[in-house]
Design a protein with these regions (language model features):
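Bergerat-fold GHKL ATPase/HATPase_c domain
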Residues: 1-53, 175-181
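Conserved ATP-binding N-box helix of the HATPase_c
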Residues: 41-73, 125-126
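Hydrophobic/aromatic residues in the conserved F-box-adjacent beta-strands of the Bergerat ATP-binding
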Residues: 68, 79-80
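Short beta-strand element(s) in the Bergerat
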Residues: 75-79, 143
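Flexible ATP-lid and adjacent glycine-rich G1/G2 motifs of the Bergerat
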Residues: 90-146
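N-terminal assembly/transducer modules of large multi-domain enzymes
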Residues: 155-181
């Protein structure tokens, strides 16, 4: 597979190739600019950003059921995610937290939170937390992930557990003015 990548690079020019390394089982390491690599550290600003990125990953893995359990003990927030998505092969369970590793070579998505599928979300989570790992997973069996972070390392949004409050905007439509959006 790496020979194929080398051949394509020699024919099309190194700059046109999106794949740096084929990791097998549908996973690749993408090329990325230094600016994107440095931005990864700033992609995760709050605990809620972790939840959003993990939900996006579950969605992209085909999960239609995702469960989240959370605790906070001695200043450490622990999140456990369970999903019924496509799963992570055993030999990729540590590598998916490396920069630019993705199974989404042809399916990068743009949604309200930005671009997803560059292989940077799990890397960003790992860079900004004390622990991020696959607890268990199997191909077509779903996955369980655990993420732990000290409250003084990554904050939680102040309104994360407040009740939503709807108010009318200038056009008379109800919008969420307070609480989770």
């Amino acid at each position: 597979a790496n020979e194929l990548i080398s051949f394509i690079a020699s024919m099309s020019g190194e700059g046109n190739l999106r794949v740096e390394e084929n990791l097998g089982e549908g996973y690749v390491r993408l090329r990325v600019s230094e600016a994107e690599r440095r931005q990864a550290k700033h992609d995760i600003q709050h605990v809620e950003d972790i939840v959003i990125e993990m939900l996006r990953n579950a969605r992209d893995a085909g999960a239609d059921k995702v469960y989240l359990a959370t605790t906070k003990e001695d200043g450490v927030r622990t999140l456990v995610f369970l999903d019924n998505g496509s799963g992570v092969p055993q030999d990729m369970q540590e590598r998916i937290f490396d920069a630019r590793v993705t199974s989404k070579l042809e399916s990068m998505k743009m949604d309200r939170w930005g671009v997803h599928g560059r292989g940077m979300a799990l890397f960003s989570i790992k860079q900004n937390t004390d622990e991020a790992r696959v607890v268990t997973s199997g191909v077509d069996l779903g996955s369980a992930f655990k993420v732990s972070v000290a409250a003084d390392r990554l904050s939680e949004r102040a309104d994360q557990s407040s009740w939503p409050q709807a108010v009318k905007d200038e056009d008379g439509r109800y919008v969420c003015a307070r609480g989770p959006h």
